[in-house]
Each structure stands twice: as structure tokens, then as C-alpha cells.
Amino acid sequence: MAAPAPESAAMTALPHALPSPDDRPAADPRTDSAALAGRLCVRYADRITGRFSLPAREGRYAPLPEDLPPALARALAARGIERLYSHQADAWSAVRSGADLVVVTPTASGKTLCYTLPVVAAALTRQAKALYLFPTKALAQDQVAELLELNKAGALGVKAFTFDGDTPGDARQAIRLHGDVVVSNPDMLHQAILPHHTKWAQFFENLKYIVVDEIHSYRGVFGSHVANVLRRLLRVCAFYGVNPQFILCSATIGNPKDHAEALIGRPVRAITESGAPSGEKHVLLWNPPVVNPDLGLRASARSQSNRLARLAIKAGLKTLVFAQSRLMVEVLTKYLKDVFDHDPRKPARIRAYRGGYLPTERREAERDMRAGRIDGLVGTSALELGVDIGGLDVVVLNGYPGSVAATWQRFGRAGRRQQPSLGVLVASSDPLDQYLVRQPGFFIDASPEHARIHPDQPLIRLDHIRCAAFELPFLAGEPFGSDDAAPWLEVLAETGVLHGEGGRWEWIADSYPANAVSLRAVADGNFVVVDRTDGRQTIIAEVDYSAAALTLYEGAIHMIQSTPYQVERLDWDGRKAYVTRTHVDYYTDAIDYTRLKVLDRFDGAIAGSGSAHHGEVHVVRRVAGYKKIRYYSHENIGYGPVTLPDQELHTTAVWWQVPQAALEAAFESRQAALDGFLGAAHTLHTVATVAVMAEARDLHKAVGSGDGAWFAHADGRGRGQLRSLDGQPGDPAVLARFVPTVYLYDAYPGGVGLSEPLFTRHAELVQHALALIARCDCRAGCPACTGPILAADEAAERTPKSLAERALSLLTAV
């Protein structure tokens, strides 16, 4: 049975519940977003596939706890807080009972007080310390600002400090000695605190609480690393004779209790019922209009998001637009600035917010939004988390963010001050987007996704046992996680970094292992963007390693606050991109290819005339060039070459293949089979993402040979093109062995557990893929089923849609 929507009130489809423009006066600011929803429903009825409403919800309250320190009660009263929400009172009771706790309530429901009250109370009465961990610096700085406000209101004297990479060296000792609450992030704990725990002895000896917020963001490889960092933290705490309590918080996910327990390795109590009041929320599912019925092509989500944001801002509503990439943030920001910021005598009303900007720029955007000086903000998932940007009226999603949980997290940014709000999901041509807006019932009924981590993934675990051995010697029989660490210690001893003697394993190497372990990326090191305009050399942005190949190649247009910079030189080894400001009427988009090779088969099964498999694969991703795309018209005006190192990873995958004899019987040519398998891969990826409720970015697809000799991609016409391992075009007709294979693979090193359940359901996935194609109303294939195509003049039995159906039929039971 599906879990309810991320509010305690159930979400229901209300075909006539949204107010018409005349139902309520637009002059009343409390109903502006509702009135806009009504106007949109009337004016754009043909584009709205789903209309839902969450009614306003009354708050449930509890008095301040009797055992709350009087000074803290006075501080709360000074800030206008004279009672608690019910979940805050429940959290106080649970923490006071000694339980480890996870609080899972909607955005803006007051989760912060769930841990602030016990932490400050303990600091006031027992001089106890607390460590806060947040996934981003912005959240950490928000939290310190909140604690300082509470301190100021009650003259409490509790000392709270951030400890991150920006903390000056001369301030670090004072923080270690005098901080009651130290607010940091997993990376700093991993690299700067645990390896130097002896400098933190006084802090650790008095550590009472460990607060881990936004735990839904700790999933996949990052979450698996963080779980091991917490294992190391508890090991150091035990050395200092303390066993701190955990207080964890999360946005709505499908498995909060299980996920929290996997992170900390201990049982937790879960609080999932929110007592916070909520304003009326309206949700629209928006499918752009069809512009080419034959090909099933629709207007771009970008143009529709731009239109919706313009309408909302012109109506005086504070609006946030979420884009799926940094590039799209800049493109949408430019479009909105062209409308609203054209008058140089008036202050800018539109801002961009994304990773890669300098911290000062992001903090300024946050302050301006809170103060009401910005009418429209365009951001990436960086704004999903709880950064305070004040009250918003409208949230527009430029494309489905990849998960139900992330969708509600983003919609939750509006209506944070209990006013009515509007959220609009604008579907892109991505098949997953189309699947959702065409079946709005799925969106209502779907449970939020499960967060998956694998703390015992061998490479990750070995990395952290190495770090833990540097921090403290291991004793014979000592576990790390649920198992004895001895086999891992023996491996490290063989490499010469550990020495075992007398039941004790000591670190003997000169290296500093934490520096060699990245929690967030396959490889270490962000790239800095250096502006050389006018002969200067100024660092203006940072780009993480995984995005550098797609955004910082030579010739790329790299946009910052919608200002275009051209990349003149990329120093890959030095992690620097040199840019100059430019004036062009286009942006650039990378062209990349993926090839795979099977390393090991874990399991296999018959799948119709073919077979399905689960195993380990080697993935190589190559950026081969880029396209120049003109603003507004979106026409492709040219190409450029890219020469960069290949990006490689080992991961797990599920794959399907059909023997050559069966292919030759089903298809008139190898080219037809290649087209069919590319369409099948597109469709299988869509239904697989939904089946395991994964985020689209966690699961990738590819088509290649069973032996890794070639790979395939769709050309500009949407037809299959075979390429050899050096990336050169090839002809499938000349191959001695032709066994096209569809791969769905975990997008993280070692995998995050997606491929195994997909293999278990391989037959079901093929049936769902066939049903998706059958339900699609296009004639020849389209982005919603088999992928985009540019020509559809073939006979019906030779269209990409028909060929994909034929390929999938070979994989069904005979």
C-alpha cells in the first residue's frame, strides 16, 4: 500500500477544486497563488494533465516541557515561541529517554527545534558538547545563525561555531577548546577532525549529541562513505569513554527508520507525524503542447517553465524555478533577466543559485531572497535542502527531478510561512517525465523512494578501515561495522601500511590516508574556473570533477549568473579552466558516448529467445565533442571537437541479449536490430527507474556488444549508429559476431544495489516496456517511448517503435 503524500492530510485529485480567477480577490496576497492556479487551469486546460490539492492543515501543539531549563524557555518566548508542535514535544521526550532518534516531517515543519532544544539544554545544565553534521556549508551557516539568534534572545552563552574548509587556522584551536556546538560536514569530519582527534580531546570527552540533518541526501556512494565515517567517529568516541546519542532528521523518504539505522549501525526511534500547520497547496502536472504530431514532439519544458515563471512574477508572486543542470539554470536565468532586468535603473529581480558559484555569491542570493529583494530565483538541487530563502509562493520544476521524494521536497519550498502555494511540474520530453504526467494517478499513489546505501561495499570499507587504523590502532577481534576487521587489516599489512604484533595493528606508513579518500566523487579534486578577462586572473567558480568533462572542455560556453565565459584552456591535471568573458548568441552542450565490458556474471536466466544477466561491468564514458545551440530558436549552429581523458568506473549492471540466430530470424538487417535495441533500451530504462523507484541519475543505460567490441548510440535522426572502441563509426553488417546487448547499470562505483532487484524482475520489466510502447499514441516512436527521431517515412513495420517492440518481444517468454 502506498504511503501518503508528504503531508499528513491525504492528497486527492480535485477536478473542480482549484479556484477560478473570480472565486477569490487577487488583491488578497494569501490567495494569489491559488488564484494563479485557477487562471492557469482555465487558460491552459489542454496542457494540464493532473490537478491536485492539499488542504490547509491545522497545527497540533504541546506545551513547553516542564523540565526545559528556564533560561531556554525565556529565550524561546523572546522569539515568540510559547508552545511546541506535537512532533517537537515527542522528540524532546524521546531524546530525554536516551533513545537515538530520527525525525521525518515535511519541509518547514520545525525539525530544527527537535535537536536544538536538547542540545542547548544539555549545554546549559551539564556543559555537554554537540556535533552537528550537514551536507552543505550553506545549511551549516544557517544553523549557526539560528543558534546565535536564540543565544542573543536569551543571553544563553552557548558558543556555536562552524568548522569547515573556510575556517581560518587561527580560529580552529579556539573552536576545539571552547565550542559547545560545532557545526560541520562529513568531509571535514573525515579529513580534518577524526585524523586529528587528539587535538579535540576535550570536545570528545564531553560529547553528548551527534546531530545528522538531511539524511535523505546521504545515499548511494556518498551515503555509504558517510556511514563508514560515522563508524570511525563512534570508534574515536569510545576511545574517549563516551557514547553520544544520535538525533537524525530527514525529508520524507520511504524507509527513514531503516536508512537511519544503516547510517549509524544502531536502532533508532522514528517520529514521522508532523504537528506543524500547513497552508493550502496546489499542484499542477503540465505537459507542453505537441508541436509535431507525427513525431510526437512537444514544446520544450524550458519554454514552458519560462512562461510560467514570467506569469507568476508578473502577478507579484515570489517564484523559484528548479532546473536539472547548471547549464539550464543559466539559460533560464538569462531568459527571465531579458524580461525583468532590462531596465538598468532598477535593481535586478532575477538571480541564479547553483553549485560552482563562490560562497559569497550564494550567501548574497540567500539574503536578498529572504529580504524580498528578489522576485525570481533559478536554482538546482542545491536549493532542495533546507537553506532558508524566506517565503515563496510558487515553485516551478523544469522537468521531473528523478524521484517522488525530491519532487515533494522542492514543492515544499513554497508556502513555508503557511500561506497558500502552487507547485507546477513541467514535463520534459524525457520518457520518465512523460510517463508520470500521462499517468497522474501514479504520482498520487507512489510512495517516496527508499534511500539505499552499502556501507560494507568492499572498496569503500577498506578505505575507511585504512583511515580508522591511522586514527587509532586496531586490537585483535575488534569489529568495524558488523564484522571482524582482521581480514581487512591483513590486506593492509600486506601493502606495508600496517604492522600487526601482540594482538595490535599499528599504522606504520608516512601517508595521510584520509586525503586519498573522496566521500563524494570517483576522483579527487574540484576544478577552479579562472577568469583572464582584461589580463586578470580571478577565480570565479568551482566545478566538481564529475561535471568538468561535460562543462569545461575547450570551446565551451560556461555561464555564471547568465554571463557567458568561453573556456580558452583546460588544464586537466592542474584542475584549472581558464576563461574569458564573451558575447555570443549560443550556448554549448557536450556530446558523450558510453561503452561497457562485462567483467563478471553473478547470475543469469532465460528471457524468451534470449537471456538476462546480472554482474559486474567496466564503463568508459568519452566526451567526443560539443554542439553550439542558438538561444531561443535552439537550432544547432555548429560542432566542436573535445579531447579529454575517458571517465571510467567499475559497477554492477543487469543486461539482456539475444543470440545472433534469433536476431537474423526476427530482423531483416542488422541495422534494423540495432535500431530496435536502442529503442528497447530507452523504454526499459524508463520502466526500470519507476520499478525500483530510483532517481534517474542513479541508473544509466547503454547498448553495445556482448563482448565489449563495439557500442551504439542514436544519431541525429534517431537511428542506431555503431562505433568501434576508438569512437569511429562502424558498419554492423561487416561484424563476424553481432550480439546487441541492452545494459542498465548503477551510475556509481561498485553499485548501490539497483541492479540486483532489476535482475530479479527482468521479465516484468520487459512486459512493462512493451505496455508503455503500446500505450503511446505516436506512430513511429517518440521521446516518450523509444526516444526522439527526426524522420518517420518508413513503413509501419520498420519504424523505430515497431523495431523496439520486436526486440522486446524476443525477450518475452515463448
Predicted features along the sequence, with ranges:
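Generic alpha-helix initiation/capping and coil-helix boundary signal
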Residues: 2-6, 84, 462, 762, ...
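A detector of low-complexity, intrinsically disordered, Ser/Thr/Gly/Pro/Ala-rich segments
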Residues: 8-10, 29, 378
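Extended, highly charged accessory segments
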Residues: 245-248, 427, 469, 476-552, ...
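N-terminal accessory nucleic-acid engagement/regulatory domains that precede
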Residues: 12-67, 747-749
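Short, mixed charged/polar active-site loops
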Residues: 112, 157, 537-538, 564
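N-terminal amphipathic/basic-hydrophobic helices that include classical n-h-c signal peptides
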Residues: 1-21, 145
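Helicase motor core with emphasis on the C-terminal RecA-like subdomain
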Residues: 39-79, 83-86, 90, 95-190, ...
